[in-house]
Amino acid sequence: MSRRTVAKKRPVAPDPVYQSRLVSLLVSHLLKKGKKSIAYNIFYAAMKNIAETTSQDPLEVLRQAVLNITPKVEVKSRRVGGATLQVPLEVKADRGTALALRWLLIAARNRSGRNMVSKLSAEIIDASNNTGAAIRRREETHRMAEANKAFAHFRF
């Protein structure tokens, strides 16, 4: 194993419009080929779309969506004897948020639609209402953990 010290978490600067660290994390996951300004434009257009559609605070809709998607448990492969077991583990807060953002964007990209703005806003609205592909992904992860609860004593 490495003898190096554990890398420190770098602080995430809040975004310029909403002053939210969550928005910065989402935009960082959204960007492609380092084009952050385009990612911000897509995100802010999606937030405007959410505000028009739901007539609610778009930041609150986003927070609720991320909260709904965040998994509580996940499974991790562990080799015991000759078999590879799926061991359920609790998800830490930072990892849970990262997984939620990743799943939200994957679901938005896989959605059918004209552009990323409409797909992202529709997925965020669906997730805030506990529907959509990202929510299904979280439920599938929870089902896997529930099915493998017998192996929970194999801690890491």
UniProtKB/Swiss-Prot annotation:
Cystine connections: none
| Compartmental location | Plastid, Chloroplast
Keywords assigned:
Chloroplast, Plastid, Ribonucleoprotein, Ribosomal protein, RNA-binding, rRNA-binding
Molecular-function GO term, any one: rRNA binding
- Any Pfam family from its record, for instance, is Ribosomal_S7
Q: What does the record list as GO biological process?
A: translation
Keyword RNA-binding assigned to the entry: answer is: yes
> What CDD domains is this protein classified in?
uS7_Chloroplast
A GO cellular component term found in this entry reads:
small ribosomal subunit
TM region(s), chain numbering = none
Domain of life here?
A: Eukaryota
Q: Which InterPro entries match?
A: Ribosomal_uS7, Ribosomal_uS7_bac/org-type, Ribosomal_uS7_CS, Ribosomal_uS7_dom, Ribosomal_uS7_dom_sf
Q: Please give the subunit comment from the record.
A: Part of the 30S ribosomal subunit.
* Task of the protein: One of the primary rRNA binding proteins, it binds directly to 16S rRNA where it nucleates assembly of the head domain of the 30S subunit.
Family membership noted in the UniProt record: Belongs to the universal ribosomal protein uS7 family.
Protein name as annotated: Small ribosomal subunit protein uS7c
